[in-house]
Amino acid sequence: MNYNIEGEPLPVVICNLEANETMITEKGAMSWMTPNMKMETTSNGGIGKMFGRAFSGESMFQNRYTSMGGPGMIAFASCFPGCIRPFQIAPGQEIIAQKSAFLASTSGVELSVFFQKRIGAGFFGGEGFIMQRLSGNGLAFLEFDGHIKEYELAPGQQLVIDTGYLAAMTGSCQLEIQTVPGIKNVVFGGEGLFNTVVTGPGRVWLQSMPVSQLAGAIRPFIPTGNYSYITG
């Protein structure tokens, strides 16, 4: 399988498959494909993994697209302005990603639930108690909001991240929550009560425009039920 990622900031990944190669995706992620791509909806791992995907923000079922009788093509477009990034997954090299980041993968990649070790990280970190874990062996495509900045953290090196900007990290990183010090900072700083702290070793991917931040910015401009139009 080979691929091209085109069209940022409204990207699409176009995958060209050999005969009998398979791509796995979430419900509704397919954008266009050749007629010989056969779709099969599956639980892909049984009841346990179905509910694990549901808890991590994904659909309980997944779609498998297989190229039948020869080469085929299938495309997956991002649902929000941002970028699509490829991740090579290998045994022992997991990727932990924000909820709803998974777009598509080859058949060797497993998507499961990731429980943060420190419960406070889930309740106060802004991205929920559960994240996504990608493991196995294959190629995965993740979609992120806005521009992506990557950092390589040395052992013990830390990065303090505002809520929602953590897009993904390698499984070797540790995640915890740090309280913003000082009542004045909390009340007047406008940055909330907590920050996410990621500790290396490992790689971290940050996104520049989390959809939650964008929603908060435009919410004051959305008409409510009491809004009335002036007509002539």
Task: Tell where the protein language model's regions lie, with residue ranges.
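Composition-driven recognition of glycine/serine/threonine/acidic- and proline-rich low-complexity segments
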Residues: M1-G232
